[in-house]
Amino acid sequence: MENVNKQSFQEVLEYVRINRQRNKLLREIGDCERKIRDNKKRVLLLDNLTDYIQDNMTIEDIRAIINNMHDDYENRVDDYVIKAAELSKQRRDLKTRMKELKASHAALAKKGKE
């Protein structure tokens, strides 16, 4: 019986650890989504800025800088999209593991009562 309680306690600790990790991933996913949104806004801003700059302003260097910034922001958006996908996969894996632990714990508790 003591062995069952010890195993049950270990499973509860594992469940809590996984739940905390899942919550952390959810926060990181939200953070990535905010960063994606912010960088998309920057890309739009730079697109609009490029439309307003006229060739007669003789600021070709500024255009080059703006284009570089635009590319940098687009790359950041892509990086955050990839990171969000990776975090979502980890979250799904943890959720599956939590279900398995919960089922295992329920079976163990049922066995312990018998």
From Swiss-Prot:
Keywords in alphabetical order, please: Coiled coil, Cytoplasm
Coiled-coil region(s) at which residues? 70-111
Question: Would the keyword Coiled coil be found if you checked this record's keyword annotation?
Answer: yes
Superkingdom, according to UniProt?
Answer: Bacteria
Q: State the compartments where it is located.
A: Cytoplasm
Q: What does the UniProt function comment say about this protein?
A: Pole-localizer protein involved in the regulation of several cellular processes.
Q: Which gene encodes it?
A: tmaR
Q: Which GO terms describe its cellular component?
A: cytosol
**Name this protein carries in UniProt:** Pole-localizer protein TmaR
Q: Which family does it belong to?
A: Belongs to the pole-localizer TmaR family.
Say if the entry is tagged with keyword Coiled coil.
yes
> What Pfam families does the annotation carry?
DUF496
- Species this protein is from: Actinobacillus succinogenes (strain ATCC 55618 / DSM 22257 / CCUG 43843 / 130Z)
